[in-house]
From Swiss-Prot:
Protein name (database record): Outer kinetochore KNL1 complex subunit KRE28
Function description: Acts as a component of the outer kinetochore KNL1 complex that facilitates microtubule-kinetochore interactions and the spindle assembly checkpoint. Kinetochores, consisting of a centromere-associated inner segment and a microtubule-contacting outer segment, play a crucial role in chromosome segregation by mediating the physical connection between centromeric DNA and spindle microtubules.
Underlying gene: KRE28
Superkingdom of source: Eukaryota
Coiled-coil residue spans: 59-81, 111-132, 210-239
Entry GO CC: kinetochore; Knl1/Spc105 complex; nucleus
InterPro entries found in the cross-reference section: Kre28 (IPR031361)
């Protein structure tokens, strides 16, 4: 199982490196195309000159600022162009075909006003069409760039979540190995106490059976998560669409887990902010009101009807970043709740006592 995790981790690393390399290649290719376009524009224009470092025309850090400056410059050039175009049209209307000079009209001349209105109308029509075409092309470019960026972010997020799930698998594997070590220690202790009564032998056998049952559940959960990770990794490598579906499945699984926690917390007390279970040590730890910590230790043996009872209780509070035991209150609630089998009701009473202790 450990070898499978190593193999899966290496595969995820290789795939992630490949995606990052491809993204970097696309970025470098885009920068080269922009660089070539700028150089070609400089070569074909008498008004543009290259200054500074000729080997690095593009500074990525200044790209957004320079892009806005270029937009302003292009707007000024368009206005200059249309002024020249307007002058050209005006001269065409005011100069005869035989190139003879005609009297210059005054600003108040009706014919001058008519020609000026016609030139302005033609200019506005052409500018409107061209600006619409430019806006449409610009919008399409921005839309495609936005879609590419979203897909890249989704792929990167998928690999990050896959890595987090893999870390959880390692934690489960460590827990499983610790349980195996504890089982071996338990077996050694059992071998040294073979002279106990038949009842003790049956109890030890039952405890071993419970431990093996927990190990089997842990092993099944670990194997299921490994299988799910392999499926997610295969989907991420095959296509971006399947990767998005894996992200949705992961989010849905986390939502189900959160919903289960919320229902458990709501059934006990509304001030509970965290619940942690330790199955092997038979402990239950609660975080209440972001200040109090309650630890419940259950009896090793169950009652005749198969129920667990409270064996010990620890209470702590936080004051000025220090954890302080609540000894007096612990004695009281332990005396009241020790041996109780209604765990949920006991937890409600303990939480109320802890919260009301400072009031």
């Amino acid at each position: 199982m450990e070898a499978q995790l190593h193999e899966l981790q290496e595969e995820i690393t290789r795939s992630s490196d490949l995606v990052l390399t491809e993204q970097d290649k696309r970025l470098q290719g885009t920068l080269r195309e922009i660089d070539q376009s700028i150089r070609k524009l400089i070569e074909t224009s008498d008004y543009l000159k290259l200054s500074g470092d000729a080997d690095s025309l593009i500074d990525i850090k200044q790209l957004e600022v320079k892009s806005r400056e270029l937009d302003s410059l292009m707007d000024l050039l368009r206005k200059l162009y249309w002024r020249e175009e307007s002058l050209d049209l005006f001269l065409k209307y005011t100069i005869n075909s035989d190139a003879e000079q005609v009297p210059v009209f005054s600003d108040t001349d009706p014919k001058y006003q008519s020609l000026q209105d016609e030139v302005s109308h033609l200019r506005d029509d052409v500018m409107t069409v061209k600006n619409q075409e430019i806006d449409q092309i610009t919008g399409e470019i921005l839309q495609v760039a936005h879609e590419i960026t979203e897909k890249q972010d989704q792929v990167n997020m998928l690999y990050l979540e896959t890595t987090n799930e893999l870390d959880k698998c390692w934690e489960l594997l460590d827990e499983w190995q610790r349980l195996q070590d504890d089982q071996r220690i338990t077996k050694n202790e059992d071998n040294s106490n073979r002279k106990d009564t038949e009842l003790n032998a049956m109890e030890e056998c039952y405890e071993e059976w419970k431990t093996l049952e927990e190990l089997a559940v842990l092993n099944d959960n670990l194997q299921k998560q490994i299988d799910e990770l392999e499926k997610v990794d295969n989907k991420a490598i095959n296509s971006t669409q399947l990767a998005e579906e894996s992200i949705v499945n992961t989010v849905q699984l986390n939502d189900l887990i959160d919903m289960w926690k919320r229902r458990i917390i709501a059934s006990i007390h509304e001030d509970i902010s965290e619940i942690v279970l330790y199955p092997y040590s038979r402990k239950l730890q609660l975080r209440v009101a972001n200040r109090y910590t309650i630890i419940i230790q259950l009896d090793k043996h169950q009652t005749h009807d198969g129920k667990s009872t409270i064996h010990d209780i620890d209470l702590f509070t936080e004051q000025d970043s220090r954890i302080i035991p609540m000894r007096e209150l612990r004695k009281q609630v332990l005396q009241e709740c020790k041996g109780h089998s209604n765990i949920l009701q006991a937890l409600k009473n303990i939480i109320n006592r802890v919260i009301n202790n400072d009031n």
